[in-house]
């Protein structure tokens, strides 16, 4: 009988959003950017294709330098990962021994719990209020690591800045501020790095930079933390094409800013029109909207939209079974979504 580690055997697998195998779906379920990367970013791949027989730069120097230049930090403050999920894994493996505590909000990115549990860590869930918000700083002195996403899924609202600051000031261990959706928000936390040597900011190029298929993540922190994380990082953890596309994207950030503004504009329209269609709509600082239909069970609406070839996200979690998470797509995609919802609502009489 093959022996499986108990921490693995007893951990439910992470459930990603559905990836349809055909191209006839409107895909609003995994928070991808609806707009293609600019042409000059995609053009960067051409020169690298003949080099794919060669190993990539094992430490992603050009990508890290582009990030350092953009975010105003030194090269030795940046670690590159195979998506921000890789960064989160590296953080747990670097700073937490099995049996030690990892803390995170009771409603947040569910992969935090999966990674911590598989590692054999204890998990401490921090209670949020009825609006899925923090009620004060996270006080968990036993935690070796605290994950805090801002904006925080599934609601999509950024966390209270003062609560975050107090959390970092009081924490005994490392605090990861996960800014996966940061470019769609008016809040950032770069000044935290100047004040606290226990803070890691996690970023991804999957959302705002339209590179979900490339898997590019970044950790930005004090050099001492990055040095230890680099020991844990897998060798050649970022492929050649991902590095060159990620570098080009960061170097051409100005080309993406109008796309972020389009997402924000469409997000506002989606929130307003869902409210008109009798949804309870949560305010959002991300590229998705979290909303509950008052006239139909969310699970039933999810299935009805899927039958119309529109994918949104439903979570079978006790506190949020009334809600759907809807990625902000193009204006045309959102038009079709809203028409489908209006039709379904109208059919109920």
From Swiss-Prot:
Superkingdom assignment: Bacteria
One GO molecular-function entry: histidinol-phosphate transaminase activity
E.C. code: 2.6.1.9
Protein's UniProt keywords contain Membrane: no
UniProt keyword list: Amino-acid biosynthesis, Aminotransferase, Histidine biosynthesis, Pyridoxal phosphate, Transferase
Co-factor(s): pyridoxal 5'-phosphate
Record PTM N6-(pyridoxal phosphate)lysine, positions in chain: 207
InterPro entries: Aminotrans_II_pyridoxalP_BS, Aminotransferase_I/II_large, HisP_aminotrans, PyrdxlP-dep_Trfase, PyrdxlP-dep_Trfase_major, PyrdxlP-dep_Trfase_small
GO biological process, alphabetically ordered: L-histidine biosynthetic process
Coiled-coil zones: none
Enzyme class (EC, first level): transferase
Listed Pfam families: Aminotran_1_2
Gene3D superfamilies: Aspartate Aminotransferase, domain 1, Type I PLP-dependent aspartate aminotransferase-like (Major domain)
Region of interest (Disordered), ranges: 1-22
The keyword Ligase belongs to this UniProt entry's keyword annotation: no
Catalytic reaction annotation: L-histidinol phosphate + 2-oxoglutarate = 3-(imidazol-4-yl)-2-oxopropyl phosphate + L-glutamate
Listed pathway(s): Amino-acid biosynthesis; L-histidine biosynthesis; L-histidine from 5-phospho-alpha-D-ribose 1-diphosphate: step 7/9
Entry's family note: Belongs to the class-II pyridoxal-phosphate-dependent aminotransferase family. Histidinol-phosphate aminotransferase subfamily.
Subunit structure: Homodimer.
NCBIfam families per UniProt: hisC (TIGR01141)
Protein name per Swiss-Prot or TrEMBL: Histidinol-phosphate aminotransferase
Organism: Synechocystis sp. (strain ATCC 27184 / PCC 6803 / Kazusa)
Gene coding for it: hisC
């Amino acid at each position: 009988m093959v022996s499986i580690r108990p921490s693995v055997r007893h951990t439910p697998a992470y459930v990603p959003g559905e990836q349809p195998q055909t191209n006839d779906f409107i895909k609003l379920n995994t928070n991808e950017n609806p707009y293609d990367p600019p042409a000059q970013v995609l053009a960067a791949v051409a020169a690298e294709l003949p080099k794919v027989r060669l190993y990539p730069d094992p430490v992603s120097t050009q990508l890290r330098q582009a990030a350092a230049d953009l975010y105003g930090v030194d090269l030795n403050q940046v670690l590159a990962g195979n998506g921000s999920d890789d960064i989160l894994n590296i953080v747990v493996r670097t700073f937490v021994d099995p049996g030690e505590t990892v803390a995170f909000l009771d409603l947040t990115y569910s992969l935090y719990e999966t990674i911590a549990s598989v590692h054999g860590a204890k998990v401490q869930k921090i209670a949020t209020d009825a609006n899925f918000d923090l009620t004060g700083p996270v006080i968990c002195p036993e935690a070796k690591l605290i994950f805090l996403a801002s904006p925080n899924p599934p609601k999509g609202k950024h966390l209270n800045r003062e609560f975050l600051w107090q959390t970092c000031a009081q924490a005994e261990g490392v605090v990861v501020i996960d800014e996966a959706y940061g470019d769609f928000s008016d809040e950032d936390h770069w000044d935290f790095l100047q004040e606290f040597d226990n803070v890691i900011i996690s970023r991804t190029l999957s959302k705002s930079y339209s590179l979900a298929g490339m898997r590019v993540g970044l950790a930005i922190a004090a050099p001492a933390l990055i040095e230890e994380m680099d020991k844990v990082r897998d060798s050649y953890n970022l492929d050649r094409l991902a590095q060159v596309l990620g570098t080009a994207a960061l170097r051409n950030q100005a080309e993406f800013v109008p796309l972020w503004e389009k997402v924000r504009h469409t997000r506002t329209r989606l929130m307003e029109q869902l409210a008109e269609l009798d949804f309870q709509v949560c305010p959002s600082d991300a590229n998705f909207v979290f909303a509950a239909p008052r006239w139909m069970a969310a699970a039933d609406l999810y299935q009805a939209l899927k039958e119309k070839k529109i994918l949104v996200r439903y979570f079978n979690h006790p506190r949020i079974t009334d809600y759907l998470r809807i990625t902000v797509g193009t204006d045309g995609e959102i038009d079709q979504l809203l028409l489908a919802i209006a039709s379904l609502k109208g059919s109920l009489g």
